[in-house]
C-alpha cells in the first residue's frame, strides 16, 4: 500500500521529534534516556523497509552495547541474567566453531548480532533493576508515543478495508503486534490517572486487532479482561456493553477477515510442520551442539527427506519458533540453558506472588516464541527476564 510506504518514511521522523521533546522535558538521566531511545528505535527503525533506518537502529544497538559494557564492568553485583547470557554465549560459540561457522556469512552475521543483543539485554535489564523510576518514565513515554500512532494504525486499517493487515513502521505485522502487546502491559505497570491514559490502552488493543495477529490477541484480551474485572469493574461493565453490539454487528466481516487470513496461512501451516520434521532430522544428526547458530536458514535443505514436499522449492527459510531454532542450531546444550532460564524466571513468578503485569509480560514472551524468532530482540529478553527483575526490585525495595 502506497499509504503505508509514506508512513514508514515520515512517521519515524515525527516520532523522533516527539521523543527528543519528551527526553528534554523530563530531564532524564543517561540510563533512562538510552532505554527510551531503544524503544523508539525498535518501534520506528528496527524492521522498517528502509535500509537507512535499519542501519540507524543497528548503530543505536551498538552504542548502547558499549554503554552496557561500562555498566557491567562497574557493577560489582552479578545478576542471574549475567550468568545465563555468558553460558548461552558459550553454547553459541561452541556450535559456531564446531560447525566451522567462520565459513558462513549467515553464521558470522548472526553471531555479531547475538553478541550485541546479549550485551544490550544485560544492560537494559540492569537498568530496570537499578533505576527507581524507569517503569514510570517508560510507561509515560509509551502512552505518549502510541496514542496518536495507534489512531493512525486504526485509520490505515479502516481505509484499506477488512482483511488488510497493517505493518505501519514495521516490515511484518506480527512484529508490530508484539510491540503493541508488550506496550499495553508496560503501560499498566503504572497506575493510570487521567482519561487519556485509560483511552490509550484501548486504542492499543484496537490497533493490535488491525495487525491480524491472533497470537498476540490471545494474550491481550485475557489481560484486559482480568485487569478491568479486578481493578475497575465499572469500566469492565461499560466496555462489555459497548463491545457486545459491535461484535454482533461486525461478526460477518470479522469472519471474512479470519477466512482470508486462514487461506493465506494454509501453506504456512504445512511449512511449519515440515520445519518440525527438518528440526527432528537435524537433532538426530547433531544432537549435542546442533548445526551452528544462524545456520538453519542455509543448512535446512541438507536435512530434507521424502516426507518433506513444500520446503524443496524454497531456498531460504527460518524456523518461526525459538525452541526449534535453539534445538536445531545449538543442540541439547543450548536447549537446556534456554529452558533453564525460562523455568527459573517462572519460579521467580512464585516469589513475587504472580504480579499481574509481570505474569502477562512473561507469558507473552514465552508464547510468542512458539511462532516467531526473537533471540535477536532485546525486548524479548527483557520481557522473559521481568520476573527476576521485579523480584530484585522488591528485594532491594527499589
What are the residue ranges of the model-derived segments?
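Alpha-helical transmembrane segments of multi-pass inner-membrane proteins
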Residues: 119-127, 134-162, 169-230
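Transmembrane alpha-helices of multi-pass inner-membrane enzymes
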Residues: 185, 359-398
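Hydrophobic transmembrane alpha-helices and their immediate junctions
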Residues: 194-195, 233-235, 329-365, 390-397
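Interfacial loop-to-transmembrane-helix boundary motif in multi-pass membrane proteins
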Residues: 30-35, 77-91, 112-115, 123-154
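N-terminal signal-anchor transmembrane segment
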Residues: 1-71, 92-100
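Long extracytoplasmic/lumenal interhelical loops at the membrane interface
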Residues: 261-285, 289-330
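A membrane-periplasm/extracellular boundary helix in multi-pass inner-membrane enzymes
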Residues: 206, 210-211, 227-264, 280-281, ...
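Aromatic-anchored transmembrane helix interface
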Residues: 54-65, 80-97, 102-127
Amino acid at each position: 500500500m502506497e499509504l503505508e510506504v509514506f508512513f514508514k518514511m515520515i512517521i519515524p521522523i515525527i516520532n523522533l521529534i516527539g521523543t527528543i521533546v519528551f527526553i528534554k522535558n523530563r530531564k532524564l538521566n543517561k540510563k533512562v534516556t538510552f532505554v527510551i531511545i531503544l524503544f523508539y528505535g525498535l518501534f520506528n527503525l528496527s524492521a522498517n523497509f528502509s535500509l537507512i533506518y535499519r542501519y540507524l537502529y543497528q548503530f543505536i544497538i551498538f552504542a548502547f552495547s558499549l554503554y552496557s559494557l561500562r555498566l557491567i564492568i562497574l557493577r560489582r553485583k552479578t545478576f542471574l541474567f549475567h550468568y545465563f547470557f555468558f553460558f548461552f554465549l558459550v553454547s553459541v560459540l561452541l556450535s559456531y566453531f564446531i560447525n566451522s561457522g567462520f565459513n558462513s556469512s549467515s553464521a558470522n552475521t548472526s553471531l555479531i548480532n547475538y553478541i550485541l543483543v546479549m550485551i544490550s539485554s544485560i544492560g537494559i535489564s540492569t537498568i530496570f533493576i537499578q533505576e527507581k523510576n524507569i517503569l514510570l518514565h517508560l510507561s509515560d513515554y509509551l502512552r505518549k508515543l502510541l496514542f496518536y500512532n495507534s489512531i493512525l494504525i486504526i485509520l490505515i486499517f479502516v481505509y484499506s478495508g477488512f482483511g488488510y493487515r497493517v505493518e505501519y513502521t514495521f516490515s511484518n505485522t506480527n512484529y508490530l503486534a508484539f510491540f503493541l502487546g508488550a506496550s499495553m502491559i508496560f503501560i499498566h505497570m503504572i497506575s493510570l490517572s487521567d482519561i487519556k491514559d485509560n483511552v490509550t490502552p484501548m486504542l492499543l488493543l484496537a490497533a493490535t486487532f488491525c495487525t491480524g495477529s491472533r497470537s498476540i490477541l490471545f494474550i491481550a484480551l485475557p489481560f484486559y479482561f482480568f485487569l478491568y474485572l479486578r481493578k475497575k469493574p465499572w469500566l469492565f461493565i461499560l466496555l462489555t456493553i459497548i463491545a457486545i453490539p459491535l461484535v454482533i454487528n461486525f461478526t460477518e466481516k470479522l469472519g471474512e477477515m479470519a477466512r482470508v487470513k486462514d487461506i493465506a496461512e494454509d501453506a504456512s501451516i504445512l511449512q511449519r510442520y515440515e520445519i518440525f520434521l527438518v528440526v527432528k532430522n537435524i537433532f538426530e544428526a547433531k544432537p549435542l551442539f546442533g548445526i551452528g547458530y544462524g545456520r538453519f536458514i542455509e543448512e535446512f535443505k541438507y536435512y530434507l527427506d521424502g516426507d518433506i514436499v513444500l520446503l524443496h522449492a524454497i531456498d531460504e527459510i527460518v524456523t518461526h519458533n525459538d525452541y526449534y531454532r535453539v534445538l536445531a542450531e545449538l543442540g541439547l546444550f543450548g536447549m537446556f540453558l534456554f529452558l533453564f532460564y525460562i523455568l527459573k524466571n517462572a519460579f521467580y513468578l512464585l516469589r513475587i506472588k504472580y504480579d499481574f503485569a509481570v505474569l502477562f509480560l512473561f507469558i507473552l514472551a514465552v508464547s510468542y516464541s512458539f511462532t516467531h524468532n526473537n533471540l535477536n530482540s532485546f525486548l524479548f529478553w527483557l520481557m522473559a527476564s521481568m520476573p527476576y527483575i521485579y523480584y530484585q526490585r522488591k528485594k532491594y525495595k527499589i
